[in-house]
Amino acid sequence: PLPKPSKAAKRQSKQQRGRATRLVMLEPRSRRGVTVQLGGDIVLGRDPACAIVLEDDAYISQRHVRFYDYDGQPMVEDLGSTNGTFHNGSKLVGAKLLHPGDRVQAGTTVIEAQ
């Protein structure tokens, strides 16, 4: 079965003003607090060539989701993953603008844009 959006992925932090500048991992607990600065292309997946490698998450594709800048704005897009990516609890279709407080779930990993 496919993973369902976790409660943490559905809960959004109070919307903040400004531009998201970093990604902070919330789940799983073993990665909680790990921070990645946004900028350029950041691909998350099981492939060792990814910027964020999650080899121990069975629900993650080799190249699962990409975070990138478009005209200076942080974006997120699913890369055709098998199990999908969720943005604020909804399945991500196409690319979406990332705002501070947005949550992205790929497999069992939940990341918050800050």
What are the functions of these language-model segments?
Residues 113-114:
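Short, compositionally biased
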Residues 1-56, 68:
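Intrinsically disordered, low-complexity acidic Ser/Thr-rich regulatory segments
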Residues 37-110:
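Forkhead-associated
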